[in-house]
């Protein structure tokens, strides 16, 4: 009887082992199929294949490479006073709030971009505002870090794998755009009003991402000298750049004239591409609401995905003053009358030169026209509500 029980137990163990091995093989096959699907969708990486676990590892440590380089620089500094300044940047032992953590990482990336670290074995350019201009040779962690903090100007895309660390909406928009062009060089231009930290968190960035084609890469050879990052009033700097970014976005929307393909309108971000024959009423209404929201920040416009709060009171003051200096720039806020005698110094609105070719192929499918529910100024005033965060 005991021998029979032993035999039964052995058979059960064998069956359990076989089931376990079968499950492992099934899981392996599923992973291979998923990897094959991604390769078919996004293409193979030209140099090194990134597996799923490696991508997750890269994504989880986006800022680590930048932070490590700053820590190495700190160890090499012999001057005690200068070392103290760098320790103030890192602040390893002090617990930080979400807003403070954002500012620390933002400062590190600014330092990193400004130094053009010689050990990086990569090719990239910087604009006069120290924003990154990246291509296929640029380190991808640096590209996604610069993008996350509103410091990426242009990404020249020669292969889909360059977007592997970006979110799905950007990747899908790129694939749709690539399907209607045979161009070898596609650019992704970002018009961004960087995120703004305050005492309770971070106000998300506002941005337009525009895809287009070009025959050559623009390279910014001259980078203006800036005030040392260690001496910079970072809150004031971010307020000025966010306000300036809002004006840049507003100007770009006006230049589009509604002739675009719109891929996404979510969470304060538009993803689009130029099209000189696109006349979709729904898209024009969305762009109209975006333009109104940027011109009248305290208004409420349902087709605009910018969420409140839109900025802090300090940024509102900067935006109000800068708007007065722009020709044909509409702006209305509750500070307009109070800001008459306030002078705020900030760079003029930058002019960006872009070389692109518009896609003339029609997008398949019929256009769906929605009723235009635009409001006049009287109705807008009735909808006014606060979008300003008061800093403590």
UniProtKB/Swiss-Prot annotation:
Transmembrane segments: none annotated. One of its GO terms (cellular component) is host cell cytoplasm. Keywords: Coiled coil, Host cytoplasm, Translation regulation. It comes from the Viruses. Disulfide bonds: none annotated. GO terms for biological process: regulation of translation. It is found in: Host cytoplasm. Residues 358-392 are annotated as: Disordered. Residues 1-88 form a coiled coil. Enhances the translation of downstream ORFs on polycistronic mRNAs derived from cassava vein mosaic virus. The inclusion bodies are the site of viral DNA synthesis, virion assembly and accumulation in the infected cell. Belongs to the caulimoviridae viroplasmin family. This is Putative transactivator/viroplasmin protein. The lineage of its organism: Viruses, Riboviria, Pararnavirae, Artverviricota, Revtraviricetes.
């Amino acid at each position: 009887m005991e021998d029979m029980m032993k035999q039964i137990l052995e058979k059960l163990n064998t069956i359990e082992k076989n089931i376990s091995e079968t499950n492992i093989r099934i899981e392996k096959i599923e992973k291979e199929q998923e990897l094959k699907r991604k390769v078919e969708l996004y293409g193979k990486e030209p140099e090194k294949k990134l597996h799923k676990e490696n991508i997750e590892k890269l994504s989880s440590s986006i800022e680590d490479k930048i932070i490590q380089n700053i820590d190495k620089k700190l160890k090499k500094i012999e001057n005690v006073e200068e070392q103290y300044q760098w320790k103030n940047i890192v602040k390893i032992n002090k617990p930080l709030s979400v807003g403070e953590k954002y500012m620390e990482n933002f400062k590190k990336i600014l330092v990193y971009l400004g130094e053009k670290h010689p050990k990086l074995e990569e090719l990239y350019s910087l604009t006069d505002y120290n924003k990154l201009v990246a291509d296929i040779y640029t380190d991808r962690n640096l590209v996604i870090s610069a993008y996350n903090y509103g410091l990426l100007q242009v990404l020249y895309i020669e292969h889909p794998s360059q977007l592997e660390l970006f979110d799905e909406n950007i990747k899908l928009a790129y694939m749709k755009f690539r399907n209607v062009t045979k161009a070898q060089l596609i650019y992704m231009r970002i018009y961004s009003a960087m995120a703004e930290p305050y005492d309770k968190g971070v106000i998300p960035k506002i941005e337009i991402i525009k895809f287009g084609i070009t025959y050559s890469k623009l390279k910014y050879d001259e980078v203006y000298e800036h005030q040392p990052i260690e001496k910079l009033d970072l809150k004031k700097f971010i307020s000025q750049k966010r306000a300036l970014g809002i004006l840049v976005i507003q100007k770009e929307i006006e230049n589009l004239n509604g002739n675009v393909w719109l891929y996404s309108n979510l969470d304060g971000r538009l993803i689009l591409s130029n099209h000189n024959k696109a006349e979709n009423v729904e898209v024009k209404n969305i762009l109209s609401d975006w333009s109104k929201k940027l011109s009248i920040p305290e208004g409420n416009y349902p087709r605009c995905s910018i969420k409140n709060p839109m900025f802090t009171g300090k940024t509102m003051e900067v935006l109000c003053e800068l708007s007065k200096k722009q020709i044909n720039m509409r702006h209305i806020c509750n500070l307009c009358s109070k800001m008459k005698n306030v002078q705020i110094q900030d760079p003029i609105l930058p002019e960006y030169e872009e070389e692109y070719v518009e896609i003339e192929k029609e997008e398949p499918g019929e256009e769906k026209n929605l009723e235009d529910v635009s409001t006049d100024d009287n109705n807008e005033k009735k909808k006014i509500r606060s979008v300003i965060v008061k800093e403590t």
